[in-house]
């Protein structure tokens, strides 16, 4: 699948903070001019921006996001909440939220290069859907542990969501349960994404 490889700070300036995309922050004086339109164009622009926030934060293509919206639409609960739960339970996002990778693209690279085990098996698919009671560890070699060690050392344990636990000494994470809406690490209105 293709990924966004272009300038990341441009996306952050346009869409706001996207912690999964990059750790960089734009300079404070780089605010762009706000263009005010009225009517349908304004509503369309707001919905499009919310959708783009989700896409760029989680590193999804348009087709992947549509597939997740379709799956969430079949659920009996709120479509927006189910969509966020599906996206938050992806393996690359879980690694990012555990602090084992500094960004979601970095987590994708760890998974693609076969450094990550889920329940004792190598998983090389970043979109792998984790379930409650899944144990996520690194491969038992120095190179894999060193890659994760740097990220864990620089991460803040206070930002760890309640649905995850991490053992920093053994480089092991546990998914305790499916997350609540309040622990999503992105300010987004998921209902506007579903309406788009």
From Swiss-Prot:
This is Small ribosomal subunit protein uS4c. Its main location: plastid. Residues 15-42 are annotated as: Disordered. The keyword Ribonucleoprotein applies. GO terms for cellular component: chloroplast; small ribosomal subunit. The gene is rps4. GO terms for biological process: ribosomal small subunit biogenesis; translation. Gene3D superfamilies: Ribosomal Protein S4 Delta 41, Chain A, domain 1, RNA-binding S4 domain. InterPro entries: Ribosomal_uS4 (IPR022801), Ribosomal_uS4_bac-type (IPR005709), Ribosomal_uS4_CS (IPR018079), Ribosomal_uS4_N (IPR001912), S4_RNA-bd (IPR002942), S4_RNA-bd_sf (IPR036986). It is found in: Plastid, Chloroplast. NCBIfam families: PRK05327.1, rpsD_bact. One of the primary rRNA binding proteins, it binds directly to 16S rRNA where it nucleates assembly of the body of the 30S subunit. With S5 and S12 plays an important role in translational accuracy.
